[in-house]
C-alpha cells in the first residue's frame, strides 16, 4: 500500500507545488482524494495508470480540490478506459460534473457512478472501508478515513492436528473464518488461529479547522494527511478561513494517538515548508512534510 502525493499547495499552485490531490494505491486500485487543477501531469509522472479500478473522494467543492475532475475523466476516455469510476463528494458534486460535461459536449467512454457523501461508511469493499466525517470549513466539507480490514491470524497446523482436523478442505474453511465439524465436535477458527492481523488506517482531512470530532474520527490512524496551510503566527487567519496551522495539525494528531502525521495543503506564501515542519515536530515528532510526487509506503 502506498501514498502518492500529486499536489500539496493551497488555493493556488506554485512553481514547485500543484493543487490538492493525493492517491492511495491499494492492491491495483487507486483511491484518489481530491482532484485539483493540473493533477494529470504528476499523475502521469507517478505512473499510476489510466485503466485501473478507481474511486475518487472529493472533500469539498472549492476549485483547488475539484477542477481537475473533468480533465481526468476526458483523458481516461481518450485512453479508451472501460472500467467504471466512482466519485464521492458533498451535495452538488454530481451537478458539478454533469454541468461541466454537458457544456463541454463530453460523454465518457466508461460508466461514471456519482454518490453523495454523508457521514458514516461511504464504501464497504471486500478489503477495506472508507468512512466520512464532517469537517469545519467555509463550505460543506468532509474528511475521509481509509480502514483496511484485518486479516486472520496465523494458522496453527499443530493445533489443527491436535483437534483431529484432517489436512485439506477443512483447514481452508477454518482459515477462511468458518467453523467446522469433526467427529461430532465443532472446531472454531479461534481454536487454531493466532491473533488477527490489524488493518492499516489512513486519514485525509481536506480543508478544515482542527476539531474534537475529527480527533475522535482519526483516533489511532497509522498515517494522517492533514491541512497545514499556515505557520503558527497566522493562526488568526487560519481560523478566519477554515484552515489549520501545522502546529494545530500536530496537536490534533498527538491527541488522537496518530502514529505518523503528514502535513500538506501549504499556502503559496511559503517557498519551502521547513518552518512549518519544525513547528509540527515540536508537538508531534513523527511529523513529515508532503511534497509533490512524494511516495510513502504505508
Curated annotation (Swiss-Prot):
What does the note accompanying the cofactor annotation read?
A: Binds 2 Zn(2+) ions.
| Active site per UniProt | 64 (proton acceptor)
| Binding residues annotated for Zn(2+) 1, in chain numbering | 60, 62, 137, 207
Q: InterPro entries from the xrefs?
A: Metallo-B-lactamas, RibonucZ/Hydroxyglut_hydro, RNase_Z/BN
Q: Which GO terms describe its molecular function?
A: 3'-tRNA processing endoribonuclease activity; zinc ion binding
State the top-level EC class. hydrolase
UniProt keyword list: Endonuclease, Hydrolase, Metal-binding, Nuclease, tRNA processing, Zinc
Domain of life according to the entry: Archaea
Q: Which residues bind Zn(2+) 2?
A: 64-65, 207, 265
Instruction: Please verify whether the record's keywords include Protease.
Output: no
Give the EC number(s) under which this enzyme is classified: 3.1.26.11
- Supply the SMART domains for this chain: Lactamase_B (SM00849)
According to UniProt, the reaction catalysed is: Endonucleolytic cleavage of RNA, removing extra 3' nucleotides from tRNA precursor, generating 3' termini of tRNAs. A 3'-hydroxy group is left at the tRNA terminus and a 5'-phosphoryl group is left at the trailer molecule
Q: Which CDD domains match?
A: RNaseZ_ZiPD-like_MBL-fold (cd07717)
Keyword field contains Protein biosynthesis: no
Q: Name one Pfam family in it.
A: Lactamase_B
Entries under SUPFAM superfamilies matching the protein: Metallo-hydrolase/oxidoreductase (SSF56281)
**Its biological purpose:** Zinc phosphodiesterase, which displays some tRNA 3'-processing endonuclease activity. Probably involved in tRNA maturation, by removing a 3'-trailer from precursor tRNA.
Give the UniProt family note. Answer: Belongs to the RNase Z family.
The annotated subunit structure for this chain is: Homodimer.
* Full protein name: Ribonuclease Z
What organism is this sequence from?
A: Cenarchaeum symbiosum (strain A)
Amino acid at each position: 500500500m502506498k501514498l502518492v502525493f500529486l499536489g500539496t499547495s493551497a488555493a493556488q499552485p506554485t512553481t514547485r507545488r500543484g493543487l490538492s490531490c493525493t492517491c492511495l494505491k491499494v492492491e491495483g486500485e487507486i483511491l484518489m482524494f481530491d482532484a485539483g487543477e493540473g493533477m494529470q501531469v504528476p499523475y502521469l509522472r507517478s505512473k499510476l495508470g489510466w485503466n485501473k479500478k478507481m474511486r475518487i473522494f472529493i472533500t469539498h467543492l472549492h476549485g483547488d480540490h475539484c477542477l481537475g475532475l473533468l480533465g481526468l475523466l476526458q483523458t481516461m476516455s481518450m485512453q479508451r478506459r472501460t472500467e467504471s469510476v466512482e466519485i464521492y463528494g458533498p451535495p452538488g458534486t454530481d451537478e458539478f460534473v454533469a454541468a461541466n460535461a454537458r457544456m463541454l459536449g463530453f460523454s465518457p467512454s466508461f460508466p461514471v457512478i456519482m454518490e453523495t457523501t454523508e457521514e458514516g461508511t461511504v464504501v464497504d469493499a471486500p478489503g477495506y472501508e472508507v468512512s466520512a466525517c464532517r469537517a469545519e470549513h467555509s463550505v460543506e466539507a468532509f474528511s475521509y478515513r481509509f480502514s483496511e480490514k484485518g486479516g486472520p491470524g496465523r494458522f496453527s497446523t499443530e493445533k489443527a492436528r491436535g483437534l483431529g482436523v484432517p489436512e485439506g478442505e477443512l483447514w481452508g474453511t477454518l482459515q477462511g473464518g468458518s467453523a467446522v465439524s469433526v467427529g461430532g465436535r465443532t472446531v472454531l477458527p479461534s481454536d487454531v488461529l493466532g491473533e488477527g492481523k490489524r488493518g492499516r488506517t489512513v486519514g485525509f482531512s481536506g480543508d478544515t479547522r482542527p476539531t474534537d470530532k475529527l480527533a475522535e474520527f482519526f483516533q489511532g490512524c497509522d498515517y494522517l494527511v492533514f491541512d497545514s496551510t499556515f505557520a503558527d503566527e497566522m493562526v488568526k487567519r487560519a481560523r478566519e478561513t477554515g484552515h489549520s496551522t501545522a502546529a494545530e495539525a500536530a496537536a490534533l494528531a498527538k491527541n488522537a494517538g496518530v502514529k505518523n502525521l503528514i502535513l500538506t495543503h501549504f499556502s503559496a506564501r511559503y517557498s519551502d515548508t521547513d518552518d512549518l515542519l519544525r513547528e509540527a515536530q515540536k508537538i508531534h515528532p513523527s511529523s513529515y512534510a508532503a511534497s509533490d510526487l512524494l511516495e510513502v509506503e504505508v
